[in-house]
Every structure is written in C-alpha cells, then in structure tokens.
Amino acid sequence: MKLRIISVGHKMPDWVQSACTEYTKRMPREMNVEIVEIKPDKRASGKNAEAVQEAEAKRILEAAGRDYLVALDEHGQEVTTLQLADKMRGWMESGRDVSLVIGGADGLHDSLKHKADWLWSLSKLTMPHGMVRVMLSEQLYRGLSVINNHPYHRE
C-alpha cells in the first residue's frame, strides 16, 4: 500500500522537508509514503479563486488516479488519533493506495471535495502549508504506531 501526500505548493523551506522526511522514513516499506507536489496555478490574467482551484483540482485528480481520496479541509471530520488509526486499518485491509490532498492558497475546489472518499480536518485553524505537511506526516506515523502497538503514542 502506498500513501501519497499530494500537496499544492512547491519550494518548501528546508525545515519542512527535513521534518517530513523524519516521519516518512520511519514508515515501513508496506506503507510507503510519497510526497507529490502540484505546482500552484497563478492568479494571472484575471483568474479568480474558483478558476485556480479548478485547474489545481484537475492536476490533483490526475496524480491521485484511482486511489482512495482523502481531502484535507477545515470543514471535514475531526478525529482522534485512535480514530485515525482505525481509518488507516481500513485502508490497509482494502489494499487500495491512498492519496491525501493538501490544497493550495485558495483551498480545494468543491468538485474535488465531492469526489473525495473522506473529508478530514486536521484542525479548524488556518495553518501554513508547510506546517500541514509536517503535521500530516507525523499523524500518519502516529496512527501506524498505534496499529503496531509501538510506544510512540501514549494514551
């Protein structure tokens, strides 16, 4: 099974890359994590936010293919670590690859949210893009540590 973090944005600061690598390298081969960067669409020539979101959504869906699609959205479902671990167990049992999508500066287009298998909210707060990548990487590792009864997560 492969986990893809599909993220609109590129040229992240070194600390983001370093932190994400720290967590993704801890993941076992059978749950490999790949970070796919989608170049943000520019708001040039009078493009509004919806047009930008729509163009980005098309590229995101191409990158995700037939994966189980998780869209990170502030209006999505908030879960505990144990609930996330249960979700991850389900993903593992299904055998499908999973794409987790982080939107760009304008967020995700409604069409992508409707196609998502799950809308997940890491927080109701607005966070910097790089911070979301790091938090997502850490939470995926934490969820797997719960599944494997590893002492990283403590209740």
Swiss-Prot record:
Positions that bind S-adenosyl-L-methionine: 72, 103, 122-127
GO cellular component term, pick one: cytoplasm
Reactions that this protein is recorded to catalyse: pseudouridine(1915) in 23S rRNA + S-adenosyl-L-methionine = N(3)-methylpseudouridine(1915) in 23S rRNA + S-adenosyl-L-homocysteine + H(+)
Sorted UniProt keywords: Cytoplasm, Methyltransferase, rRNA processing, S-adenosyl-L-methionine, Transferase
Keyword Protein biosynthesis: no
EC numbers: 2.1.1.177
Keyword S-adenosyl-L-methionine recorded: yes
Predominant localisation class: cytoplasm
Name of one Pfam family that matches: SPOUT_MTase
Catalytic EC class: transferase
A molecular function (GO) term: rRNA (pseudouridine-N3-)-methyltransferase activity
InterPro entries to which the protein is assigned, alphabetical: Alpha/beta_knot_MTases, RlmH-like, tRNA_m1G_MTases_N
Subcellular location: Cytoplasm
Oligomer and partners: Homodimer.
NCBIfam families (UniProt xref): PRK00103.1-4, tRNA_RlmH_YbeA
Family the UniProt entry places it in: Belongs to the RNA methyltransferase RlmH family.
Function statement: Specifically methylates the pseudouridine at position 1915 (m3Psi1915) in 23S rRNA.
Name this polypeptide is given: Ribosomal RNA large subunit methyltransferase H
Gene: rlmH
